[in-house]
């Protein structure tokens, strides 16, 4: 299943999460959660640098996914790029900081917590996580991929050095959307070349 580090403001359990104070904070009004954009409208973003938010995330992942039989988690959209205000406040384990300072670790924390939820639910279950973004260290918790690419020879040409470069940077398990994520269905030879 594809999970994201945020929730639309219109979702039924948004109010419950808001009361648990699990979201990053507005830079101009630190008592309020920050709002960014999601596919379906405005939403709030988890603050994985906050202990209470980490526990709430694991509880969510366990109850919604792991307890119903999944051990594979697709951690997506964890770049926090739709928060246009880079001074949004994060807890950073009580030290405080901004999303601009701590954005690189958010996807790593998200993947670690998702894996922890799987292992805490069943110590014999081995989690498998995929993540679209990450910094050094994420390879301990997730495979990454090059992001949403387009069905084209140009994307294939671009993704090859991206994957190789990630490997040289210590991320041994990097991939791409085979055949492309967006655009027309790939022609036969393009799909074969992606597979090679």
Task: Show the residue positions of the predicted features.
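Catalytic-domain carbohydrate-binding cleft regions of carbohydrate-active enzymes
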Residues: 1-196
């Amino acid at each position: 299943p594809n999970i994201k580090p945020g929730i639309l403001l219109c979702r039924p359990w948004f109010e419950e999460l808001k009361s648990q104070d699990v979201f990053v904070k507005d830079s101009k009004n630190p008592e309020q959660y920050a709002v960014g954009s999601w596919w379906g409208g405005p939403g709030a973003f988890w603050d994985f640098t906050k202990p209470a938010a980490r526990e709430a995330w694991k509880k969510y992942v366990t109850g919604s996914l792991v307890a119903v039989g999944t051990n594979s988690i697709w951690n997506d959209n964890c770049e926090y790029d739709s928060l246009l205000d880079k001074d949004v406040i994060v807890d950073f384990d009580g030290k405080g900081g901004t999303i601009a300072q701590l954005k690189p670790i958010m996807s790593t924390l998200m993947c670690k917590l998702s894996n922890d939820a799987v292992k805490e639910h069943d110590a014999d279950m081995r989690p498998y996580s995929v993540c679209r973004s990450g910094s050094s260290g994420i390879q301990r918790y997730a495979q990454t991929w090059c992001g949403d690419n387009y069905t084209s020879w140009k994307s294939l040409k671009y993704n090859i050095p991206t994957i190789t470069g990630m490997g040289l940077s210590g991320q041994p398990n990097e991939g791409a959307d085979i055949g492309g994520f967006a655009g027309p269905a790939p022609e036969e030879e393009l799909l074969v070349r992606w597979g090679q």
